Amino acid sequence: MVQVRAAHPTNQDGSVNIDAWIARIGERTQLVDPQILHEACEWAQGLEQAAIDAENIWADGASSYRTGLEMAEILADLKLDQDSLVAAVVYRAVRERKTDLTEVEHRFGPTVTHLVDGVQRMAAISVSQNPGNTASFSPQAQVENLRKMLVTLVDDVRVALI
């Protein structure tokens, strides 16, 4: 397999070295307040650990936390803003119901919450197109989700990029 992106910098215990990772992100895009991104990383990491402890994992061998970091790295390469990076880091935790939008808004504000909500709406469209998924929505709900997704995209194109 070809590796296009460098592995996350790690500590001796194998955990992601958040400070080194943020420094690497800061080389790619401007961070207004790196501490906010640091807080998002620590929070997402803690939520994932709590889910692991409760045996509520996304998929064997997969890490929703590291997936969020990967998403943020791609967005940093595209020079997206800090709010987009924070939204990418915490999105999987919301999607996997390890937390909710109310808590995201409390911690990171309305802009990050708006982005995460918009990405969730887009994800709902793909879920609704999978007929084998028991979480599928009714046709009316699918239409409403599509309408909301399009409104969100018109409002903020960062949603599509995340």
Model region roles, listed by residue range:
Residues 1-162:
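Active-site helical microenvironments for divalent-metal-assisted chemistry
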